[in-house]
Amino acid sequence: MNKPISSGLRTTFLVHFILGLIFGLLLLLIPESFLGMFGWNVAQPATYRLVGAAILGFTASSWFGYKAANWDQVRIVVLAELVWAPLATVVNLWGIIRADFPPIAWINVLIFGGFTVAFWILYNQHEAEAAAMSPAAKAPAPKVPARKAARRKRARH
């Protein structure tokens, strides 16, 4: 199944790469300054640096996905995004509602929520197209000659 990657998926990978690179580097290198601009209390900068490193890891996988040619090469990356992005969305929502996340966290909800929707739609689209291209989907059902079918039917009764 060497189904090419759609332009929509390639664009999603590129946007994810760019945003991830920006936010990941800022969190990794200057979490206090970056988050402090938005009123985010950074008591433990090492924790935010770790989040920045994780974001950069997913950013690298999006770059590899952007450069890949086939669905088979990026399927696992999209599945990982379908775990990461919804979890990040829920954690940010929880932080806004139950914890002390500042209002700027709504941007995180929108970004991660947007990636959740985009990767979900593109995953389903590519899986459906890959299934339609599979040899099993293309192969016609084997034909049984009419006489053999009649004999089989009589033998069962």
What are these regions (language model features)?
Residues 8-12, 20-46:
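Membrane-helix boundary elements
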Residues 114-134:
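Membrane-water interface at the C-terminal end of transmembrane alpha helices
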Residues 62-74, 96-97:
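Juxtamembrane helix-break-helix junctions at the cytosolic face
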Residues 130-151:
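Short, highly charged, low-complexity non-transmembrane loops/tails of multi-pass membrane proteins
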Residues 90-107, 124:
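Membrane-helix boundary connector in multi-pass membrane proteins
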Residues 1-6:
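Short, Lys/Arg-rich, polar N-terminal cytosolic tail immediately upstream
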Residues 18-26, 44-67, 79-90:
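Core segments of alpha-helical transmembrane spans in multipass integral membrane proteins
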